[in-house]
């Protein structure tokens, strides 16, 4: 059989494949600047620009909007690698990717508003996040932020806290309740440069210091009527935001159809898990170099030659393998909307985060003083991975939901 020239031509990579191929260079750039941004608590604009230029910031824009149509499996792969470079950049990127993925599934944004976001995304990084956490607020309560109708649009007044990427957000999806006699709760799409909007630089945390997760203060910020989404009677809080994750009910509906909110939560859980595991992998990489290079005065061989250290490193490797198998194994199943997989992402988030934290803590324990020195990145990895818990529901809530689901299954058999 003859072979034509066309048969020998290399396959043209898809937009997703092309973006993934640019990941290593981006990760190297992020790692080179991460210590500086962590030390000074400055937002990593250059790093976000690199993520954007590589096509990674819009990876989950749906094909019907002209985007790559990246899946959750693609997303966790990207975020795990970005987490190796700079956890703050990875977390900021995660929330923008989650917004585009939500639009791909639900088309909640009005067409004109989303087109505007995509136009901005072609010109440069256009970060988006949901702002729902409020000072003193409790999960399940309606938001305190008020929306007042002025005759042609809405005026928003209130304060949101822990708003990841606050100073650089192009758009903010702000949860609020109306001041009507029978209040409604919804999400209002707010431009980051809106008049009456102020970023209060309150973020001064142990880890993720470059994420600019500041407070956002809204004072009569005007929102056009068409940018108010999902206004429903106020029976409780809505949405999820930059920090925090409510426990999901124990499984999908009886008909096997996964509710949109459950899919959104599954994406959130696995995306943030991937970042934490990526940070832990960087800690392990540093530990491996340390064990190869460190030869105490009372030894003639590096620490890595000792069975004790090899065994401890093996324990770290086993934990991270387990976490990666959970995250990367569940992601394609969530892409297929398998109810059982979606229901497992809450416990998977808990287990992956625990494994990542334990792995980095063990690495610090093995290295002693050098691991806690600001001259080395290991202590930053520890602070960042500990801070990953802010994106996780309380352990008891996750485990209680998982236990309830197990009891429900038992009652059906």
Residue ranges and their predicted role:
Residues 45-52, 59-164:
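Glycine-rich flavin
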Residues 24, 278, 314, 318-321, ...:
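Generic structural signal for well-ordered, non-transmembrane alpha-helical segments
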Residues 159-199:
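A short core secondary-structure module
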Residues 1-14, 240-245, 413:
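Actinobacteria-biased recognition of intrinsically disordered, low-complexity terminal regions
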Residues 31, 35-38, 321-351, 364-372:
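C-terminal helix-coil-helix/basic helical segment that borders enzyme active sites and/or dimer interfaces
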Residues 205-319:
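Glycine-rich beta->alpha junctions and the first turn(s) of the following alpha-helix
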Residues 48-49, 300-307, 336-353, 371-387:
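Charge-rich, acidic-biased intrinsically disordered regions
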Residues 369-413:
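Glycine-rich phosphate/cofactor-binding loops in nucleotide/flavin-utilizing enzymes
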């Amino acid at each position: 059989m003859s072979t034509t020239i066309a048969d020998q031509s290399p396959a043209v990579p898809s937009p997703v494949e092309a973006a993934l191929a640019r990941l290593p260079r981006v990760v190297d750039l992020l790692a080179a600047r991460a210590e500086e941004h962590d030390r000074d608590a400055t937002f990593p604009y250059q790093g976000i620009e690199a993520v954007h230029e590589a096509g990674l910031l819009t990876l989950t824009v749906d094909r019907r909007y002209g985007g790559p149509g990246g899946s959750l499996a693609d997303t966790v792969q990207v975020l795990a690698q970005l987490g190796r470079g700079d956890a703050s950049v990875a977390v900021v990127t995660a929330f923008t990717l989650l917004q585009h993925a939500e639009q791909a599934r639900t088309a909640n944004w009005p067409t004109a508003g989303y087109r505007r976001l995509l136009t901005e995304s072609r010109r440069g990084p256009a970060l988006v996040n949901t702002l729902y956490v409020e000072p003193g607020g409790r999960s399940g309560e309606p938001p305190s932020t008020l929306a007042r109708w002025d005759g042609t649009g809405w005026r928003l007044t209130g304060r949101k806290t822990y708003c990841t990427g606050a100073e650089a957000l192009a758009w903010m999806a702000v949860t609020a309740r109306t001041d009507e006699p029978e209040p409604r709760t919804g999400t209002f799409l707010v431009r980051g440069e809106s008049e009456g909007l102020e970023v209060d630089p309150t973020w001064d945390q142990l880890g993720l210091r470059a994420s600019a997760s500041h407070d956002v203060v809204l004072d009569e910020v005007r929102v056009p009527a068409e940018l108010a989404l999902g206004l429903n009677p106020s029976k409780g809080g809505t949405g999820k935001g930059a920090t925090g994750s409510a426990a999901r009910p124990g499984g999908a509906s009886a008909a096997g159809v996964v509710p949109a909110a459950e899919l959104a939560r599954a994406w959130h859980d696995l995306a943030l898990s991937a970042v934490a595991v990526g940070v832990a992998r960087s800690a392990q990489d540093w530990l491996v170099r340390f064990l190869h290079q460190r030869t105490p005065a009372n030894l003639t061989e590096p620490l890595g030659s000792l069975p004790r250290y090899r065994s401890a490193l093996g324990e770290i490797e086993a934990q991270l393998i387990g976490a990666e198998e959970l995250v990367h194994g569940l992601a394609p199943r969530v892409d297929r909307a398998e109810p059982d997989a979606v229901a497992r992402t809450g416990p998977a988030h808990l287990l992956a985060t625990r494994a990542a934290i334990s792995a980095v803590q063990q690495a610090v324990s093995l290295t002693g003083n050098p691991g806690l020195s600001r001259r080395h990145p290991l202590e930053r990895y520890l602070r960042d991975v500990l801070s990953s818990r802010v994106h996780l529901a309380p352990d008891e809530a996750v485990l209680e939901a998982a236990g309830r689901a197990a009891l429900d299954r038992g009652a059906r058999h």
